[in-house]
């Protein structure tokens, strides 16, 4: 973590008020004694110490590069954060002391300067603002770009992996001091820490006119912010243009190195990348109890207005599938699977009903909501209850009428239905027998009538 109290000289407190940024103060010190007895200006920790920090606390710093302890200039946050060129601060002795002049030619993969678990964006913005102010105040000539490592642009969350941001670090030719030949061996190779392949685009050799090399930056577990596309450094006074090897994109596991330029703000805005969310689709899976959300992100770097040749914008599309488990009771049906069948109907019990039962209404289509299906079921059940009650009332009234027509059961109000049916059957048979006898008697009477009529006719003729 960059701060005034670097690991090279932990006992020294930065006294420059311009360099004292609250968000850049260290969260953890390498040694507790240095924290409490660092110097006369060091203040003991108070209750409001965590109010100064906008970022989350990080693990202790990784060991810095092997700087000589007795350097002419004390280390500060700017020298720890920047990779100065020969003419950035105008102090070649400081460049030789820190051995950063020819760092671009040490190894094909640059060194890892920051921790892998740093995350945050406000420190990068303040750092860029501070560097721009320093460059505008005359510390360096305009037009010279410096590679600034932003500790949070492409950093992944703790436990996540970062694809590694890429940027261009333009180094002008400078010789490497002899006493700094050993830091390259102590630096960590990014291929060891981050074994995944990273696509690097080598830019061709550019002429004296400055051009822009677009860079893409994205993270797997977190969407990265737009990274400033670097501008290649102009040719030196000797006439040698910046080589393509020096303008290679840096690839680290925990950081994105940015190139900070003191050009106009509109030029920097033209060189920023645009991250467009192309599609955010959310589909439901009917086979399991989880929903899958897919985010498709397209990163399109803008081409610089300064370049003579127009570079082709590279697009990096990331898809992030996040299984969302919103159901904890796995015995219950899934909320994402729409039920195609209505709830089972209760069996209808009939008591000696001669009427055939109605067929069960088929299940509703799955387009109907459960609330509508429940309301229809309750209405159907209510109608069924009404019809069943009416049927029972009609049956009871029929039994009462039948009981009233049976002479033996007229005064028996507590007669059972079986008794009513038996007595009514006997009474019907008795009535039928009586009817038959009456019919026979009627026939006899009619025959007697015919005989009497014949006698009357015979009497008149005589």
From Swiss-Prot:
GO annotations of cellular component type: nucleolus; nucleoplasm; nucleus
Keywords: DNA-binding, Nucleus, Phosphoprotein, Proto-oncogene
Modified residues (Phosphoserine): 259, 261
Main subcellular location: nucleus
CDD domains cross-referenced by the UniProt entry: bHLHzip_N-Myc_like (cd11456)
Region named Interaction with AURKA: 19-47
SMART domains linked: HLH
PROSITE patterns reported in the protein's UniProt record: BHLH
Motif 9aaTAD, residue range(s) on this chain: 76-85
GO terms (BP aspect): astrocyte differentiation; autosome genomic imprinting; branching morphogenesis of an epithelial tube; cartilage condensation; cell population proliferation; embryonic digit morphogenesis; embryonic skeletal system morphogenesis; epithelial cell proliferation
Region (Disordered): 134-177, 232-289, 332-390
Function recorded in the entry: Positively regulates the transcription of MYCNOS in neuroblastoma cells.
Complex formation: Efficient DNA binding requires dimerization with another bHLH protein. Binds DNA as a heterodimer with MAX. Interacts with KDM5A, KDM5B and HUWE1. Interacts with MYCNOS. Interacts with AURKA; interaction is phospho-independent and triggers AURKA activation; AURKA competes with FBXW7 for binding to unphosphorylated MYCN but not for binding to unphosphorylated MYCN. Interacts with FBXW7; FBXW7 competes with AURKA for binding to unphosphorylated MYCN but not for binding to phosphorylated MYCN.
Record-linked PANTHER family: MYC PROTO-ONCOGENE
Domain observations: The 9aaTAD motif is a transactivation domain present in a large number of yeast and animal transcription factors.
Protein name: N-myc proto-oncogene protein
UniProt organism field: Mus musculus
Name of the coding gene: Mycn
């Amino acid at each position: 973590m960059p701060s005034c109290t670097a690991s090279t000289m932990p006992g020294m407190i930065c006294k420059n008020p311009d360099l004292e940024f609250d968000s850049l103060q260290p969260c953890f010190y390498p040694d507790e004694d240095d924290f409490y007895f660092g110097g006369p200006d060091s203040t003991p920790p108070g209750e409001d110490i965590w109010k100064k920090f906008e970022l989350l606390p990080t693990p202790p710093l990784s060991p810095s590069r092997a700087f000589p302890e007795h350097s002419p200039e004390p280390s500060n946050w700017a020298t720890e954060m920047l990779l100065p060129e020969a003419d950035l601060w105008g102090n070649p002795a400081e460049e030789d002391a820190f051995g950063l002049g020819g760092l671009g030619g040490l190894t094909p993969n640059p060194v890892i300067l920051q921790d892998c678990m740093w995350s945050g964006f406000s420190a990068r913005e303040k750092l860029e603002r501070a560097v721009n102010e320093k460059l505008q105040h005359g510390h360096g000539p305009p037009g010279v770009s410096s590679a600034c490592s932003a500790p949070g642009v492409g950093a992944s969350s703790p436990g996540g992996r970062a694809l590694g941001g890429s940027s261009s670090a333009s180094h002008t030719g400078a010789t490497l001091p002899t006493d700094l030949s050993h830091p390259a061996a102590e630096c960590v190779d990014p291929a060891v820490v981050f074994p995944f392949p990273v696509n690097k685009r080598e830019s061709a050799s550019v002429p004296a006119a400055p051009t822009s090399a677009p860079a893409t930056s994205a993270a797997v577990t977190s969407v990265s912010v737009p990274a400033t596309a670097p501008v290649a450094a102009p040719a030196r006074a000797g006439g040698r243009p910046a080589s393509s090897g020096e303008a290679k994109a840096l690839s680290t596991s925990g950081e994105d190195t940015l190139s900070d330029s003191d050009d106009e703000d509109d030029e920097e805005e033209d060189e920023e990348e645009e991250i467009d969310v192309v599609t955010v689709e959310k589909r439901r899976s009917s086979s399991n109890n989880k929903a899958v959300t897919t985010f498709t992100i397209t990163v399109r770097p803008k081409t610089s207005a300064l370049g003579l040749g127009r570079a082709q914008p590279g697009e990096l599309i990331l898809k992030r599938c996040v299984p969302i488990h919103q159901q904890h009771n796995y015995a219950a049906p899934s909320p994402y699977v729409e039920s195609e069948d209505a709830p089972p109907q209760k069996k209808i019990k009939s008591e000696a009903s001669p009427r055939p039962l109605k067929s069960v209404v088929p299940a509703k289509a799955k387009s109907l909501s459960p609330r509508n299906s429940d309301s229809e079921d309750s209405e159907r059940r209510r109608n069924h209850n009404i019809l069943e009650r009416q049927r029972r009332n009609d049956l009871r009234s029929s039994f009462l009428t039948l009981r009233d027509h049976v002479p033996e059961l007229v005064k028996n109000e507590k007669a059972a239905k079986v008794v009513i049916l038996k007595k009514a059957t006997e009474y019907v048979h008795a009535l039928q027998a009586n009817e038959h006898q009456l019919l026979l008697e009627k026939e006899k009477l009619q025959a007697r009538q015919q005989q009497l009529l014949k006698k009357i006719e015979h009497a008149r003729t005589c």
